[in-house]
């Protein structure tokens, strides 16, 4: 058997991982500006954490979860999304306690797992970035969180991103709309896909979210959720729209958007862009005021979003956005002869401790091959170290661009390498 990675997974190799690190650093730095702190939860959870919160009728639970019984016969699932684990942690660790500052803002970056058909930007193990804000029902929280996503795309230079917006209202509004949707769809039940027929009585809003052609056709003239919002729900949505207008963030009201998870209420949103004439959602989220109490905590308003790193990097690539990845080293040490091996090790360590990036030859190659490696590594400076340099405790260093050379004592190199770089015009 040829040993290979499982279908739907990937190896992120050196070089490619530098792009990931750059994007992740941009994300972390931006989230700090909005006062979000990182949370890290387990990669696997009890099955009920996901099934009960995400929704028993969702595709995630019915088709896509990786779940198993462990040796203690506990029903376990690899996490398919990040919000439910964070809410579980919020309740379990009593972060709702009065001594914890509100709103509580957290973000995560990590692997998620769904059994899906692998395609560009969608894998069975994928990496998700998410933010969760607990304790504020102010519409400004909705807008600030959406604006943070918008801010991220601006920082990365991503173009042609459209914000789609909708409201699911409060539970009373949603229930009234649910019944209206059942009344509309029941007479045309036979025209729906098999999945949507099954969902019609369990969760008819799922039909709006279906990608099946027959379902899309069936809901074209379906009633709009916005016609069923009560006064408080309408006021919340109006405030969100007004604040987005004030921040000059354009949006499209999309009444067929319901999101793929059952725990949302009030504001929901997606950021969508086009790749090769195909629409691609790159960030999505909304308000979920009932989820904390569902996990046994107190009534707590909450808002958040998730975005896929694979999709984000795919879009950056397709839009031709080059990331400023640093791929240089400060010094390459060419080592000539076994006598210089220990000295090269000693000098390299001393320079690294001063905060510089150093590589050296380990393979005893000819000098020409070593110089070629220095060029491959984009070394700013080359040091050529042999037995005579070891004896004299002095060595020549060369600026790899200007070819300027200086001769410096080992002592100076080990104590003040920055002054050596200045002598070379660096």
UniProtKB/Swiss-Prot annotation:
Quaternary structure (record): Homodimer.
Subcellular location: Cytoplasm
Biological processes, Gene Ontology terms: histidyl-tRNA aminoacylation
Family assignment from sequence similarity: Belongs to the class-II aminoacyl-tRNA synthetase family.
InterPro entries linked to this entry: aa-tRNA-synth_II, aa-tRNA-synth_II/BPL/LPL, Anticodon-bd, Anticodon-bd_dom_sf, His-tRNA-ligase, HisRS-like_core, HisRS/HisZ, HisRS_anticodon
This protein's GO CC annotations: cytoplasm
Classification via PANTHER family: HISTIDINE--TRNA LIGASE, MITOCHONDRIAL-RELATED, HISTIDYL-TRNA SYNTHETASE
Main location: cytoplasm
Lineage of the organism: Bacteria, Bacillati, Bacillota, Bacilli, Lactobacillales
Listed Gene3D superfamilies: Anticodon-binding domain, Bira Bifunctional Protein, Domain 2
Reaction equations catalysed: tRNA(His) + L-histidine + ATP = L-histidyl-tRNA(His) + AMP + diphosphate + H(+)
Protein name: Histidine--tRNA ligase
């Amino acid at each position: 058997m040829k040993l290979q990675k499982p279908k739907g997974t990937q190896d992120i190799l050196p070089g490619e991982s530098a792009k990931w690190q750059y994007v992740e650093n941009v994300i972390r730095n931006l989230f700090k500006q909005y006062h979000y702190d990182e949370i890290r939860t387990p990669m696997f959870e009890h099955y009920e954490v996901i099934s009960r919160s995400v929704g028993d009728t969702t595709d995630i639970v019915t088709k896509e979860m990786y779940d198993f019984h462990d040796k203690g016969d506990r029903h376990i699932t690899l996490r398919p999304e990040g919000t439910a684990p964070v809410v579980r942690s919020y309740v379990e660790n009593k972060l709702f306690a009065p001594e914890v500052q509100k709103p509580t803002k957290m973000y995560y970056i990590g692997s998620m797992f769904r059994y899906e058909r692998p395609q560009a930007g969608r894998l069975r193990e994928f990496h998700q970035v998410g933010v969760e804000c607990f304790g504020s029902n102010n519409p400004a929280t909705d807008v600030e969180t959406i604006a943070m996503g918008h801010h991220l795309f601006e920082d990365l230079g991503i173009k042609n991103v459209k914000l789609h917006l909708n409201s699911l209202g409060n539970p009373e509004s949603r229930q009234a709309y649910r019944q209206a949707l059942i009344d509309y769809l029941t007479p045309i039940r036979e025209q729906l896909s098999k999945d949507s027929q099954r969902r019609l009585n369990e969760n008819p809003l799922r039909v709006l979210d279906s990608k099946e052609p027959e379902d899309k056709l069936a809901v074209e003239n379906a009633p709009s959720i916005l016609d069923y919002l009560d006064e408080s729900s309408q006021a919340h949505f109006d405030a969100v729209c007004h604040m987005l207008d004030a921040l000059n963030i354009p949006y499209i009201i999309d009444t067929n958007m319901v999101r793929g998870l059952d725990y949302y209420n009030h504001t929901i949103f997606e950021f969508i862009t086009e790749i090769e004439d195909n629409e691609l959602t790159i960030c999505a989220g909304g308000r979920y005021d009932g989820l904390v109490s569902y996990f046994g905590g107190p009534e707590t308003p909450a808002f958040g979003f998730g975005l896929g790193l694979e999709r984000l990097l795919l879009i950056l690539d397709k839009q031709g956005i080059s990331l400023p990845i640093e791929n240089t080293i400060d010094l390459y040490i060419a080592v000539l002869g076994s006598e210089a091996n220990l000295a090269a090790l000693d000098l390299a360590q001393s320079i690294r401790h001063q905060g510089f990036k150093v590589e050296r030859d380990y393979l005893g190659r000819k000098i020409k091959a070593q110089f070629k490696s220095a060029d491959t590594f984009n070394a700013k400076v080359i040091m050529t170290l042999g037995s005579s340099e070891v004896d004299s405790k002095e060595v020549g260093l060369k600026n790899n661009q200007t070819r300027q050379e200086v001769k410096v004592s080992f002592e100076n190199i080990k104590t003040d390498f920055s002054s050596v770089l200045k002598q070379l015009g660096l």
